[in-house]
Amino acid sequence: MALMRLGLRIPARLGSNLPVAQLGIRAAKHRFYATAPRNDGGELPSIKKLLMIGLAGTAVFVLAVNSLDKQQPKNSYSESEFESLQRLKRKVALFPGNQLKVYGVLGTEKYNKIVSGGKIVDPRKIIEKHRTTAGDRYEALLNILYDKYGAVEYFDMLPQGLMVKLVSLYMKDNCSEGDTVVILDFPKSIKDASQFETEVAGISKFIVSQKLKDTDICKYYDAVGKLESV
């Protein structure tokens, strides 16, 4: 401030010959402002890039939807899909197509009125053989059920699918293409019927006593035109 009152000048080597007061005024006139950084044209996203990003997002969305659709259980089929499914079932059966003529019999011994001859398959005898054969893989389980339910009732207490499995093993060793087969007292349930026809062979006729016509298994075979009552 003393320099300003005396009117002294700043030496030239310091960059100006103006009085200090005037230098302050001149400097105040030249203020600096912060400016936003300039964007070169190349840094801005082009329309092509935006379109590519949009298409990529759409593709991801479609894949996600398709993935969810595949996880949903399929509960309806077109006619061609249903036929393909049936062909697949026939291919995995032990005796696919019409290799065997199989008659199921339930609650009657008069089946010979409808079918004569043929190989007789008795599930009870098959199960008993497995139960009484030492070292058989099913011996222990069958004997547990036998001891718990008795010699008669234990046949009806087998785990779901076991009777079909044992009948299938027997037929694999004792039946061949072109045979007529009569299975006694089988099937007793729609589950057994469905499993047998999928895994072993189709049933041509289901022969039953008149008194059993109103049971679920009889209604099942009646609906497909395979029920015969005697």
Curated annotation (Swiss-Prot):
Highest taxon in the source lineage: Eukaryota
Localization per record: Mitochondrion membrane
Main location: mitochondrion
Keywords for this protein: Membrane, Mitochondrion, Transit peptide, Transmembrane, Transmembrane helix
Bilayer-spanning residue ranges: 50-68
Transit peptide: 1-33
GO cellular component labels: mitochondrial membrane
Membrane topology type: Single-pass membrane protein
Record-stated family: Belongs to the AIM36 family.
Protein name: Altered inheritance of mitochondria protein 36, mitochondrial
Gene that encodes it: AIM36
